[in-house]
Amino acid sequence: MKKPASEPKKCGATTGDLGEGAHRAWGALLRSHAHFVERIERKLSAQGALSPEAYDVLLMLSYAPNHRLRMGELYETATLSRSGLTRLVDRLEKEGWVKREVCPNDRRSFEAVLTASGEAARARSWPLYAQAIAREFGHFFDEKEAHTLADLLERPLGKGESEAQV
């Protein structure tokens, strides 16, 4: 008599051990991220477009109510360290794309506020950014594979955390 099939064991779910699949996936994720970001940044830089980090900050502000976020809230959505985000916001402020304002509810905090010229810079960069993503990343996957990959990568983030689109 055949044993009933058991559920597949999740990597490290009970023992803390890292399975071969999880180890391989983690390494591939890190290498792929570095590979694609470097190639896309190079293309964008050659075309005089915003960096992916600058674009993402401007995008998060464009989605925010009244186009403003506290610096702490912006940090939670950014892919930079706190000091890296502060330096980036400094640069965006010098360009006139973002301004800092004292938070009306907490005078100890600052909000980053998207300016009209910041939104225009983001909008100008999007076609170049989309083209670079398509050329450097998108052509590796058909539409179904891209959705599957997105679903898998979004799973650890939990529902709602991945809703902001590039």
Labelled PLM ranges:
Residues 1-20, 143-166:
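C-terminal regulatory/oligomerization modules of transcriptional regulators
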Residues 1-48:
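N-terminal leader segment of winged-helix/HTH proteins
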Residues 2-4, 8-12, 90-148:
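Charged, amphipathic alpha-helical coiled-coil/dimerization segments
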Residues 36, 40, 78, 121-140, ...:
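Alpha-helical linker/hinge and terminal dimerization helices associated
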Residues 38-81, 165:
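N-terminal helix-turn-helix DNA-binding core of bacterial DNA-binding proteins
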Residues 71, 89-90:
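Short, hydrophobic-biased segments on the C-terminal half of alpha helices
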